[in-house]
Amino acid sequence: ISIYKKTDSVYQKVYEYEKTAEFTHAIYGGMLCGHPAAVIGHRKGERNLIAFSWNKAEKKYQAEIIDRDCGPANVFHYMKDGADRLISANREIDEVALYTLS
């Protein structure tokens, strides 16, 4: 999983996740807990659901694992009662999961 930034009409890689994440799925991009983020899952290997965001204090991208070994196929984000929520179709373990994030 890599993040590219467009500078002077050219995309350059600015971040690469340190682990292999085969068969990526479950993509959401938008605000998450008040910050721009991307949520990406993968269905092979470790099969994690991961949130990627920019850490302003450390001036670098960071990855936070939301769930492990779940094999997500799709995610949906919504807000309820002021909390960010993700619904994930964790296909590889035959589960639909609700995550409340803070």
Across the structure, where does each feature detected by a protein language model lie?
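Beta-propeller-forming repeat regions
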Residues: 1-102
